[in-house]
C-alpha cells in the first residue's frame, strides 16, 4: 500500500498520484486478482487517452471526466492519493471547475462506503450554493451512484 500524502504539505506529481492510487486499488481488492498491475495501468492509460476524456489534477487527486453523448453531462472517476479532508476540498474545487466549464450534470460510481461521510459534508457545502448532490445505493448492492446537478449560483465564491 502506498501512503496517502497531505497535498498541503507534499504535492505529488501526476504520475505519483495515478500509479500510487492504482497500487492501492489493487492491494485493497478493488481491482480483481486476475488483472495484473501492468494490465490495470494499461487500462487506465487507455481510458485517459480517449478524446472524450479530460483529466484534471487538484491537490493529490486526479479527476478523470468522460463526456457522455449529451455534452453537458459527465461521468467522473477519481484517483486519489490525498488525505480525506483534502479530498473533499479537491472534489468541491473540481465541481466548481466543471460548473464554470458549462457542465450541468455529473455522475460517479462510488465503491468504497468509507467515502459516504465525506460526501455528506460535500453535499452540505454544495447545497449552500444551490447545487444538488445525491448518493443512492445501487440495486446490485455493490456500491453507490453519486449524482450532482449544478445550480445557477457559482461555486467559486467561498463556501
Please identify what each model-predicted range represents.
Residues 1-43, 158:
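Short amphipathic alpha-helix that is part of the acyltransferase structural core
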Residues 3, 52-53, 127-139:
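Short secondary-structure junctions
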Residues 18-22, 41, 65-67, 91-97, ...:
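Extended low-polarity, hydrophobic cluster-rich segments
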Residues 45-49:
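Short loop/turn motifs at secondary-structure junctions and domain boundaries
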Residues 50-84, 152:
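Conserved donor-binding loop and adjoining core beta-sheet/short helix segment
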Residues 70-131, 140-141:
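Acyl-donor binding region in acyl/amide transferases
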Residues 134-159:
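C-terminal "cap" of GNAT-fold acetyltransferases
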Amino acid at each position: 500500500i502506498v501512503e496517502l500524502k497531505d497535498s498541503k504539505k507534499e504535492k505529488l506529481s501526476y504520475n505519483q498520484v495515478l500509479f500510487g492510487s492504482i497500487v492501492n486499488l489493487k492491494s485493497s481488492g478493488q481491482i480483481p486478482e486476475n488483472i495484473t498491475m501492468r494490465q490495470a495501468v494499461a487500462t487506465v492509460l487507455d481510458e485517459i487517452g480517449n478524446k472524450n476524456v479530460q483529466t484534471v489534477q487538484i491537490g493529490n487527486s486526479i479527476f478523470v471526466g468522460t463526456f457522455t453523448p449529451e455534452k453537458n453531462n459527465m461521468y467522473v472517476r477519481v484517483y486519489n492519493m490525498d488525505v480525506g479532508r483534502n479530498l473533499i476540498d479537491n472534489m468541491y474545487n473540481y465541481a466548481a471547475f466543471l460548473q464554470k466549464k458549462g457542465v450541468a450534470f455529473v455522475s460517479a460510481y462510488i465503491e468504497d462506503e468509507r467515502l459516504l461521510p465525506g460526501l455528506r459534508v460535500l453535499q452540505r457545502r454544495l447545497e449552500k450554493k444551490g447545487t444538488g448532490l445525491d448518493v443512492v445505493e445501487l440495486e446490485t448492492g455493490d456500491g453507490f451512484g453519486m449524482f450532482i446537478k449544478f445550480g445557477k449560483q457559482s461555486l467559486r465564491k467561498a463556501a
